[in-house]
Amino acid sequence: MLCSRYFTSSLFLWGEALPTLLEEFLNEVEKMLKNQVNTRRIHQLLKELDDPLLENKDLEEKLQAFLDYVKEIPNLPEARKRYRIQKSLEMIEKLRSWFLIDYLECSGEEVDLSTDIQYAKGVGPNRKKKLKKLGIETLRDLLEFFPRDYEDRRKIFKLNDLLPGEKVTTQGKIVSVETKKFQNMNILTAVLSDGLVHVPLKWFNQDYLQTYLKQLTGKEVFVTGTVKSNAYTGQYEIHNAEVTPKEGEYVRRILPIYRLTSGISQKQMRKIFEENIPSLCCSLKETLPERILEKRKLLGVKDAYYGMHFPKTFYHLEKARERLAYEELFVLQLAFQKIRKEREKHGGIPKKIEGKLAEEFIKSLPFKLTNAQKRAHQEIRNDMISEKPMNRLLQGDVGSGKTVVAQLAILDNYEAGFQTAFMVPTSILAIQHYRRTVESFSKFNIHVALLIGATTPSEKEKIKSGLRNGQIDVVIGTHALIQEDVHFKNLGLVIIDEQHRFGVKQREALMNKGKMVDTLVMSATPIPRSMALAFYGDLDVTVIDEMPPGRKEVQTMLVPMDRVNEVYEFVRQEVMRGGQAFIVYPLIEESDKLNVKSAVEMYEYLSKEVFPEFKLGLMHGRLSQEEKDRVMLEFAEGRYDILVSTTVIEVGIDVPRANVMVIENPERFGLAQLHQLRGRVGRGGQEAYCFLVVGDVGEEAMERLRFFTLNTDGFKIAEYDLKTRGPGEFFGVKQHGLSGFKVADLYRDLKLLEWAREDVQEIDVEGIELPEEIKLIEVG
């Protein structure tokens, strides 16, 4: 047995100690080494150690040597103490690596993983049909069908330590078995005893277990089940327990729990995996370079897959998950690296920029640039004068001043003698950008054109001609810019606004209008770093992380649905003062399934019953783009006092007088969407308000909304949204398939994502064939 003789013995324990596993012991000691070494606590943990791994003599010796090394730390001088703590932490990692992971020993023939699942051990034609319902059709599918959960049966609780509501594993002898028949139910009861305590085990209408349990009478067994308190006697009992002989196969280990389909039980499923997974894992070829495995201390592919199905410890499971998550992210970054390298092959055109126009423009502005804007402009300019084509993502919060930075890039590009193409997702945004740009550049001899779907055929031809002969310096437009018959004389800069509405292919199509053009992508939605690396891994990232001084925050309030009339009255007062309001609903039309309001029905109600004295507009996703643009322009021009809408206005033109945003059923939106909606008001510099009108929602939804009301930083909100809703929901669409990672999680795996981005720089990507599914990053 492990000895605690090296630690002080003047200890006391608070009651009966619960068993401690080796990995828990190492985790606790690691925490102490990073904070303060407590030899009394280590001694207490040693007394509680109960782990089947301790039967390994080699482990016992190495663990004792480790404890010998740690015991002196509190008495050492500071410098030696720091050194020994560092070495102790390294020893913990070695102990984990040696004893907490099962390393596969492979022998025999390799298996073809594309083989039909029918030929797996224990499957056959009948089970093949059942497994197909789960998406398992080949041996590789079986290998990649990871458990949905795990059950830890390593800790053995004493019968007198049981607590109601807990699922536990305990042990003892079956001393009696009997069945009692009632009118609607048969109750099978077996009594488990450790010699001092007796606990009834109960099953309901499961008479078939009686024979099995009688065979185990008088024998030592392990029992796993949920502890209940008897409603009449108060005695603890275990319901629907799984009883295993002491020498059974599912004893003192972590068990995988798989998704099931009708006709196949968890026990049968587990058996199929146990019979096949070792040989399937041994048939895998290593996919990552050896130097990366060593550098990042990652498991080999065989041990990682095995650990996902049959982890020896939770440390083993986490290392397995880490390896496979890293690989998914590595392959994604590899794809982006290939795109980067392909672009760099062609080189860029170093632009000669003196900066005189930009300097003159900055002086003419009625405000000073923030330091973040200056830094962003300098990063973009450095790209433009370099020999590599720029591929940069510019992002910042709502109102952080991205447009001015883009205008400075246009001026630099013009000064160098090149044309600019500025693509946005909607005509109305194109019109807004066009008007702003014309106004901003009125002092300069820059010819700006607008090319959208509504542009007349004759005007289109005139613009196309001007682009071809170089008379037009800047063109602002929608998808019309990537039509085949749009050609440029000397395109040098492509700016794409609201990037997440365009795919990589559309971006590339516009870039291909010129030779070695610089590309600036602008995202209005603040994107967490992990999302930026995953969605825009082929781009460098510039963040405007500073808001202009003096910008007023929008006051945000949660209001219960039964006080919505007070909100309407507030809207009335603000409109009478000259303001305008948005009232947003999650649906276009009323839904029978969801108890939420819709834009159409509420428009009718608000127009007639609540605001008959005001002009109301209606906008939703079913309107054509032309109709949406018309309504939005009319609202911006003041023809409507209130705009009733769905989230189609989350990104739209500025409405300077709009200062009230009312969002009903806000729990139906992501926080990133809500933040964009809130950003629609207060753009004229006046006091602005955002009301979240909430009905009967769960605590989790309320927690999200409370977080939103207390935070105005778009990046914090984006991180929180990613954490709580995932990447697919974050953008409102399942984009790029990134929500389809089997293992990787963009919120928790930022470190792995950064590793992968760094590591692909060391790889020669020439000739590397990417998996078929990774080509999804090119989806337009």
Swiss-Prot record:
GO-annotated biological processes: DNA recombination; DNA repair
UniProt region (Wedge domain), positions on chain: 154-252
Positions that bind ATP: 367, 369, 399-403, 436
Limits of the Helicase ATP-binding domain: 383-544
Annotated Helicase C-terminal domain residues: 563-728
Segments for region (Domain 3): 550-780
Domain 2: region residues: 351-549
Enzyme's top EC category: isomerase
Positions of region (Domain 1): 1-350
Domain of life per record: Bacteria
Keywords: ATP-binding, DNA damage, DNA recombination, DNA repair, DNA-binding, Helicase, Hydrolase, Isomerase, Nucleotide-binding
SUPFAM superfamilies the record matches: Nucleic acid-binding proteins (SSF50249), P-loop containing nucleoside triphosphate hydrolases (SSF52540), RecG, N-terminal domain (SSF69008)
Family the UniProt entry places it in: Belongs to the helicase family. RecG subfamily.
PANTHER family the UniProt entry points to: ATP-DEPENDENT DNA HELICASE HOMOLOG RECG, CHLOROPLASTIC
Role noted for this protein: Plays a critical role in recombination and DNA repair. Helps process Holliday junction intermediates to mature products by catalyzing branch migration. Has replication fork (Y-DNA) regression activity, unwinds stalled or blocked replication forks to make a HJ that can be resolved. Has a DNA unwinding activity characteristic of a DNA helicase with 3'-5' polarity. Might be a DNA translocase rather than a bona fide helicase.
Name the record gives this protein: ATP-dependent DNA helicase RecG
The species this protein was found in: Thermotoga maritima (strain ATCC 43589 / DSM 3109 / JCM 10099 / NBRC 100826 / MSB8)
Taxonomic classification: Bacteria, Thermotogati, Thermotogota, Thermotogae, Thermotogales
